[in-house]
């Protein structure tokens, strides 16, 4: 079983909210808190589907069946914070998107950092997805939008 949990995430840039509102044709500021929540959900959904970071996050990855003592990390990894087995820190090497250890780790905590090219590519999909959420589109439409990632 693999379990990926967001421990901490950066806020979406304020400019993204204004760009989303322009994309969706929303002129007033009365719903900004709702729109910000929708935008945050869209950002997290798109970055999960694309497996690339749009905002900096700290993740905790739990994996109970590691093959070959290598754990694949998700999204745009910038730093491994800790690797633990049965609650104790273990030595590891970090190569590419994988953490290699002498024996199976249970938990890897790591940070991600977005890349400008990923933001440029994925932000239009975020706005499209957020607009669909705002408009109450069905799950089939939402899945179709995410398939563009």
Residue ranges of predicted features:
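Divalent metal-cofactor coordination and adjacent catalytic microenvironments
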Residues: 1-149
């Amino acid at each position: 079983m693999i379990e990926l949990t967001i421990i901490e995430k950066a806020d979406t840039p304020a400019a993204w909210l204004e760009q989303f509102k322009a994309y969706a044709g929303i002129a007033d500021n009365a719903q900004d808190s709702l729109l910000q929540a929708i935008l945050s959900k869209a950002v997290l959904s798109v970055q999960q589907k694309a497996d690339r970071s749009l905002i900096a996050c700290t993740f905790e990855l739990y994996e109970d069946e590691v093959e070959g003592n290598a754990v694949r990390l998700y999204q745009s990894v910038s730093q491994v914070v800790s690797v633990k087995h049965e609650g104790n820190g273990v030595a590891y090497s970090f190569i590419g998107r994988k953490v290699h250890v002498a024996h199976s780790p249970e938990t890897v905590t790591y940070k991600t950092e977005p890349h400008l090219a990923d933001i440029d590519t994925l932000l239009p999909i975020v706005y499209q997805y957020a607009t669909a959420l705002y408009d109450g589109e069905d799950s089939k439409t939402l899945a179709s939008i995410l398939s563009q990632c």
